[in-house]
């Protein structure tokens, strides 16, 4: 199967996000790449479901708390930028202070 680099990136994010989701269910704290992948996947999937950019920006701030990530991870992620495909095209979603 031949995939474009962007498609490979999305699959890699999705795979890491699934791992993060499983770890969250077990109560394991997420590291930096897992937290980034988890937030990114939720934004990408919300866009595919027809949500708006504004809804995704708000939703992105509700996904993780400092208690769900390893020490120092929340400080490493002051913002997350995700390029997602919405019904009206591809847009950049920026989430400021995603881990509260």
From Swiss-Prot:
Its pathway? Nitrogen metabolism; urea degradation; CO(2) and NH(3) from urea (urease route): step 1/1
Q: Which GO terms describe its biological process?
A: urea catabolic process
What Pfam families does the annotation carry? Answer: Urease_gamma
Name the Gene3D superfamilies for this protein.
Urease, gamma-like subunit
User: Which catalysed reactions does the entry list for this protein?
Assistant: urea + 2 H2O + H(+) = hydrogencarbonate + 2 NH4(+)
GO MF entries: nickel cation binding; urease activity
Q: Where in the cell is it found?
A: Cytoplasm
InterPro entries listed in its UniProt record: Urease_gamma, Urease_gamma/gamma-beta_su, Urease_gamma_sf, Urease_subunit
User: Keyword Ribosomal protein on this protein?
Assistant: no
- Which EC class is this protein assigned? hydrolase
Annotated signal sequence range:
none
The record's annotation in PANTHER family points to: UREASE
Q: What is this protein called?
A: Urease subunit gamma
Q: From which organism does this entry originate?
A: Alteromonas mediterranea (strain DSM 17117 / CIP 110805 / LMG 28347 / Deep ecotype)
Q: Which gene encodes it?
A: ureA
